[in-house]
Amino acid sequence: VLRRHARHVQTNEPIPDALIERLKRARRFGQAFETVRYTASALTDMAVHALPQGRVPADPVAFEAQVLRERGLPPGVGVNHRFTHFQHLFYGSSYAAGYYVYLWAEVLDADAFGAFTEAGSAFDATVAGKLLKHIYAAGDSVEP
């Protein structure tokens, strides 16, 4: 895609292969921090939903700090959402304790894209047809 569309604004030359290789090597830079941040938010989500019915932390900030300390969050990493504005916690029972679904979605995405990688092209028509038939069109009609 980059070779086709990324061009120099003045010369219209395509992006150099060396720059594409540098981008590929750097694409996962810092990913571990992002994974830890998502996991920290998911752990906080699970902790609040594991509380007995009707129990609300008296000090939400202290509750969050305790949960993250007990789970071993490395100092300086931070979280995606501070407990006091983490709206996913309060979207009703259909979203209760489910923030980890974003991590699961990344796993499924990587697995599906792996089929295109194995085929040698992100535009492989055969793989795209299987994705359409077995995932998109099937939707939730088949038991996992």
What is the predicted role of each segment?
Residues V1-P144:
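C-terminal, non-catalytic "cap/extension" segments appended to globular domains
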